[in-house]
Amino acid sequence: MFLVAARPSIGKTALATSMVCSICIGAKVPTLFVTCEMSEASIARRIMASVASVSMGTLKRGNLNPNEYQRVFSANSKIGAAPLYYCNAVSGMTSAQVGAEIRRAVRKHGVKVVFVDYLQKVLPTKRHEKRTYEVAEVSSKLKAIADSCGVSVVALAQLNRESEKEKGRTPRLSDLADSGQIERDADTVCLLTRNREESRGEAQLLVAKQRDGECGSVGLWYEGPFCRFDDNPELKEVP
């Protein structure tokens, strides 16, 4: 299981949709996106903004200029041809129900990669006396599903407030919210950080755990209007 964690409004979903654009739309790998917080339409709009390089605000208002309209038309063709499937879990789904949806998508569509946005929003199959036990159950179930179905699960997760108490402190594995079991279940843990007050700018993806590799950090460029992360700062200009 591959885990991407950050504080709210840092860009977890934007990073996930950027990965979808590369894995599914670019490489045509069958992908399932389990959305527990935003509607399917909201995720689809973010993917459109990323692929077309048209801002979310412009897409919402619908006042596209001819150049933007052409980019949206082209992006729509690319997205429509991609093997991308959705599971809407906004109303609440247990880990068992999410597992059933993943297995169905694997059987029906040959899905190879699953995104879960986000882990702490998935419900446990039964109530526990402590929140940490509930999150631990969900994390363990997602790990088991990944292993049994032979799929790569990319789970998003929240960091707790400790990462923000000290100004300038980078996130740590111990900042994962609600359960240390998440850290133990994940094969790779990446912690995303940036200045949330900037709509564009540099970001860091800290590889805090990697079971079969080295840890370190990767520099990214955040394009807030397009809900996108690029790995090359020279791509920050609007085409």
Could you describe each region identified by the protein language model?
Residues 5-6:
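The Walker A (P-loop) glycine that initiates the GxxxxGKT/S ATP-binding motif of P-loop NTPases
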